[in-house]
Amino acid sequence: MLDKVLKIATRQSPLALWQAQYVKARLEQAHPGLKVELVPMVTRGDVILDTPLAKVGGKGLFVKELELAMLEGRADIAVHSMKDVPVEFPEGLGLVTICERDDPRDAFVSNRYASIDELPAGSVVGTSSLRRQCQLAATRPDLAIRSLRGNVGTRLSKLDNGEYDAIILAAAGLKRLQLEARIRQPLSPEQSLPAVGQGAVGIECRLDDAWTRGLLAPLNHTETAVRVRAERAMNTRLEGGCQVPIGSYAELKDGELWLRALVGAPDGSQLVRGERRGPAEQAEALGISLAEELLDNGAREILAAVYDGEAPR
């Protein structure tokens, strides 16, 4: 069936196109002769740029249109940044492949200052993420944190125009766009716990499409998949979308998983942290157990405020 064309649904931002091209190249390398095409599309999250993401509401702002294309047969797979993938999928679709994780860290970017510690009181820092915002506000309550939307290039332009003294972006995105030189300080997980799945690329497809699933199998990276599975299980129990003040990061060494997570009040006034260690085979159970602990320790109330009064059960 190599005469059939595999179609990839993708957003049109430079970073999304990089990710789709990366998957295309990996597929062509694994299956010589396979024809792969990109199907660029615009999502709701790409259109609504004048409102902070947390206020736009809804889960899957960056993926729904791609999923519709797969359900209607206009595309075979969709390539996502894992941190944008909702915890639930439409019937018939699922996440079947997670590629090897790139740098999971956040990055401090500034033209004038080399680190967060160097920022004077009152400095304006841009981020669209409640997760980054709550952690930054907790350590530096003297900073002015402002919403920052748009693709990576747009955000850097706003920094360069002087609208912000510094901005926080995902290190992986900057590296993929060959903008690593803009990173002044990579932020360790201790400084800024990453988003669920940050740095990993995931591939979604129709679950009954055996041909496509077979083509995707060689791209799956088992260690990354285990780590992201633990992070996503924790996030699912917290009913987290891609715009919630939730951080989670799993590391795997010699078969043992170390999972850290936090839920924070957006203003940084409260951060609830926890961690779990256990065998990789129990990735989901560790994630759920950690989520329960966070909920019992105050995360339920924080999330109820973020979700307009609806706390995770």
UniProtKB/Swiss-Prot annotation:
Origin: domain of life: Bacteria
Annotated HAMAP family: Porphobil_deam
Signal peptide: none
GO biological process: protoporphyrinogen IX biosynthetic process
Family affiliation: Belongs to the HMBS family.
PROSITE patterns linked: PORPHOBILINOGEN_DEAM
InterPro entries cross-referenced by the UniProt entry: HemC, Porphobilin_deaminase_cofac_BS, Porphobilin_deaminase_N, Porphobilinogen_deaminase_C, Porphobilinogen_deaminase_C_sf
Note: The porphobilinogen subunits are added to the dipyrromethane group.
Enzyme class at the top of the EC tree: transferase
The keyword Transferase belongs to this UniProt entry's keyword annotation: yes
Sample GO molecular function, one term: hydroxymethylbilane synthase activity
PTM sites of type S-(dipyrrolylmethanemethyl)cysteine: C242
Name of the protein described by the UniProt record: Porphobilinogen deaminase
Needed cofactors: dipyrromethane
Gene3D superfamilies: Periplasmic binding protein-like II, Porphobilinogen deaminase, C-terminal domain
Gene: hemC
